[in-house]
Amino acid sequence: MSQSLLAQLRKMTTVVADTGDIQAIEKVRPQDATTNPSLITAAAGMPAYQKIVDDTLLDAKKQLGDSAPSDKVAKLAFENLAVAFGKQILAIIPGRVSTEVDARLSYDTEATIKQAHAIIEKYQKQGIGRERVLIKIASTWEGIRAAEQLEKEGIHCNLTLLFGMHQAVACAEAGVTLISPFVGRILDWYKKDTGKDYVGADDPGVQSVTRIYNYFKKFGYKTVVMGASFRNTGEIIELAGCDLLTISPKLLEELDAKEAELPRKLDAEKAKGMEIERITVDKATFDKMHAEDRMAHDKLKEGIEGFSEALENLEKLLAKRLEELSAEPVGAK
């Protein structure tokens, strides 16, 4: 009996849902789930989650007191909201959820560590152990240093917005749990830069993840690779066998609807026998490689700016909703 592409993929790769939409997660039943400020913002705007948003806002206001300015309440509410969505998601999935620190802290090691501690503490207050949470941090040099410290404390990290080999190797050498190289965003950059289209194994994003995966397996790093940011199912098919792949509900449904043979493309045993040169990445090497890699430089900067903007938009949305709730007569809810 033939199987769907998704069913075959699950046999060789841990399938993760890339969404904050709890109903979508219930439908696709992944092992793990990843969220980010853009996904939380999208979910927070859905009528189905209005109660979670409202309860989180009122709780943040209660914590800070009635006289606290709405923007300060909104800031705390976002942290609480990310954890509230994470808690609901963890009630559905057997694995872990990734919750992102504020992207505006991407170049501040100490502030990133402090917020990671706050997120883990919030989960623990909800009865959720740190082993079920991955702290998502942008793959800047400062972010990688924060993750290195957090891992030593037993707080597991997912290093995101990863576009270059220098970022990947620095993460592996720091002993982080997981990295998320962004397949689709790499493709976007090359399409715009060259005016060409890329399909299948020729996709630069696919090539980047393949190179990183083979490097990690060749040299026995414990850091696992989770391909992210897919534009089409073709990219996913080319990365079958990767440790994990985080996929949007739409593409998960497409994979589930199609039946065809799915061969393993990435193989840890084969990677061990490959001729690959080892590199060491200190800060000077990282900065040099980053400056020379236009794509990684551009996409990391753009990604941090994009997540920061999404966060600011959500905080404005939350502040506006807080004012509406404050104006409602007592007992109206």
Swiss-Prot record:
It is found in: Cytoplasm. Keywords: Cytoplasm, Pentose shunt, Schiff base, Transferase. Its main location: cytoplasm. The active site is at 136 (schiff-base intermediate with substrate). Signal peptide: none annotated. It is an enzyme of class 2 (transferase). Gene3D superfamilies: Aldolase class I. It holds the Pfam family TAL_FSA. GO terms for cellular component: cytoplasm. It catalyses: D-sedoheptulose 7-phosphate + D-glyceraldehyde 3-phosphate = D-erythrose 4-phosphate + beta-D-fructose 6-phosphate. HAMAP family: Transaldolase_1. Homodimer. Transaldolase is important for the balance of metabolites in the pentose-phosphate pathway. This is Transaldolase. It comes from Acidobacterium capsulatum (strain ATCC 51196 / DSM 11244 / BCRC 80197 / JCM 7670 / NBRC 15755 / NCIMB 13165 / 161).
